[in-house]
């Protein structure tokens, strides 16, 4: 089987080189250059964790395997796939709405409840992995390299905003390991609570003991989990 070519686009321009090694070098240089822009935001998708967390298609296959002996659930799931572009989040949204409707008319639907439970359990099992497992080290190293590049930059540049659609905890584990300060919108101690207003806070440290003089914390990350988290 021939090696798949890596494609790299900037807008509509194909910047890919004749071989993958040269393309990867170009991508690394472009990311390095962009990380030094004054205002920079990153959106991390499923591909970043794909070496450890299944892709959407792999989740679909896993769920289909679990319901292969349940004809009614198979039929419902097939229709949901076709009408929602095989997007599990959209599929769950439809199922949640149906469950609420059935409860609203006092006619609970066990098949709907069971299918929701199977999907939720499959996602939880595959995302809630042991991050200390050495088989995931390559993924952790990728995250480490990324955060070291984007956070240890000129402190006069604006804060870095990281957005992710992933539910896993690779970001948090690496940020903790690298001792990087981050704000994920949560406050509190024993009982954590989400307060989106915290994303507007500036975190500073006192630099003069005799006067009220402060400077912003170095390497501060503002971290947004757009689709929630496995530990919420």
Residue ranges and their predicted role:
Residues 1-34:
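N- or domain-start disorder-to-order transition segments that initiate the globular core
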Residues 21-71:
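An N-terminal structural lobe/cap that precedes and organizes the functional/catalytic core
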Residues 23-29, 137-151:
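A short, well-structured juxtamembrane/interface segment
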Residues 31-34, 150-157:
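Alpha-helix termini
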Residues 42, 61, 121, 144, ...:
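A broad, structural surface signal
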Residues 64-96:
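A phosphate-binding glycine/aspartate-rich beta-alpha loop in the early core of alpha/beta enzymes
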Residues 83-113, 153-232:
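Extended, H/D-rich, highly charged conserved domains that either
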Residues 118-142:
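Glycine-rich phosphate-binding "P-loop"
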């Amino acid at each position: 089987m021939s090696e798949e070519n890596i494609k790299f686009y900037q807008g509509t321009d194909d910047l890919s080189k004749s071989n993958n090694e040269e393309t990867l070098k170009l991508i690394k240089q472009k990311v390095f250059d962009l990380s030094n822009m004054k205002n920079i935001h990153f959106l991390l998708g499923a591909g970043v964790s794909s070496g450890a967390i299944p892709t959407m298609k792999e989740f679909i296959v896993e769920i289909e395997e679990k319901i292969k002996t349940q004809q009614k659930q198979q039929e419902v799931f097939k229709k949901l796939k076709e009408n929602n572009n095989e997007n599990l989040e959209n599929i769950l949204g439809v199922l949640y709405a149906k469950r609420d409707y059935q409860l609203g008319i006092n006619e609970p639907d066990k098949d709907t409840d069971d299918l929701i439970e199977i999907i939720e359990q499959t996602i939880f099992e595959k995302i809630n992995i042991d991050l200390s497992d050495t088989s995931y080290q390559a993924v952790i190293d990728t995250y480490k390299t990324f955060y070291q590049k984007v956070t240890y930059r000129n402190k006069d540049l604006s804060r870095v905003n990281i957005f992710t659609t992933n539910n896993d905890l690779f970001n948090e584990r690496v940020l903790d390991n690298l001792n990087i300060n981050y704000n994920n919108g949560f406050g509190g101690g024993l009982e954590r609570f989400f307060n989106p207003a915290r994303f507007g806070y500036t975190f500073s440290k006192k630099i003069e003991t005799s006067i009220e003089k402060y400077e912003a914390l170095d390497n501060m990350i503002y971290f947004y989990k757009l689709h929630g988290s496995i530990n919420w």
